[in-house]
Every structure is written in structure tokens, then in C-alpha cells.
Amino acid sequence: SPNNRMPVIVDHDNQIDGVPLSVFESGAILMYLGEKAGKFFPQSSPHRERVLEWLFWQVGGLGPMAGQVSHFVNYAPNFPGDHSYSEERYKNEYDRLLGVMDRILSERNYLAGDYSIADIASFPWITAYKRYEVDLDVFSNVRRWFDDIKSRPAVRKGIEVGKDCLLYT
């Protein structure tokens, strides 16, 4: 990755000038894999655009705000200074974003209608809600969505693989 950060994948089956293709950043990876596999990423309008809206909403909003909440709730207290403004600001924004999810999920089962890369991208940012000091039951539709995705066999398998290093609820 030019950013020297994870995630990145390398596809040896797809090469550019004899060099395996590398794809970095979560959203780009999910789009690439969705297109390659022909799953969870519609190929036609308007469904594709709906998935892209929610994928970019996660990449630009939910993920960064959850990361900030996690930092100020779990790590900043280990450093001197008053971090209460920052913690409150990011907790409020994370709650606002959960409210956005809750409203849209009152109308449909998944963010873009059918289960998609938008849900795959968003799910990890909800899994640590207890660490963020959030009562997920306040957002009943998000809770239903979360429980539904968490019960999917492939998701269960992934959680099991990472159970020793992840903080899933």
C-alpha cells in the first residue's frame, strides 16, 4: 500500500505488466472482491448506486467517528489532559450516525436493501459498541441488523477465526 497501512490484498490471478494486482483501502477492496465474485455488489443501477452511497457513508463517517470514539473512550484517558470535549463530541456524532442507520433500517433489512458490501463494511464498526459505551438497544433497528448479520454463517466463521484478538460482543 502506498499509504503503508493495512488493509491491502494482492490478487495473483490479476496482473498488470506481470505484477500481481494490489488493492488497498477497505472500500476499494470490497468493491473489487464484490465485482470479481459477482456477489454483494450489484452491477446495475439503481441498486449499485444505493450500495455505493452506504459504502461511502461508512468510509467517510461511521468508520472514522467510531475510531475517534474508541480513541477518546479507551486510550486518551491514559494521557494527561482533559479529553471530555473530544470524547463527548465523537460519542454524539457516533450516536447521530447510529440514528441515521436506525431510520433507514426501519424501512429495509439492510442498508442498501439487500445484504451488500455496505453492510460488510459497516458491521465491524458496530461490533465494539460496548467499548464505545453505547446502548445498542436504543437503536432497535440497528440492533436487529447487527444480530442478523452476526448470525450469518460466514460472519460467525470470521468471528471465530478472530476471537482471540477481536473485541466482538
Where are these regions (language model features)?
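GST-like domain detector, emphasizing the conserved glutathione-binding G-site
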Residues: 1-88, 92, 102
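Alpha-helix/helix-capping structural signal
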Residues: 28, 153-154
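GST-like fold's C-terminal all-alpha helical module
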Residues: 58-153
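Charged phosphate-binding loop/patch that engages nucleotide di/tri-phosphates or the phosphate backbone
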Residues: 158
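Exported/periplasmic ABC-transporter solute-binding proteins
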Residues: 161-162
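Conserved small/polar residues in nucleotide/adenosyl-binding loops
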Residues: 168-169
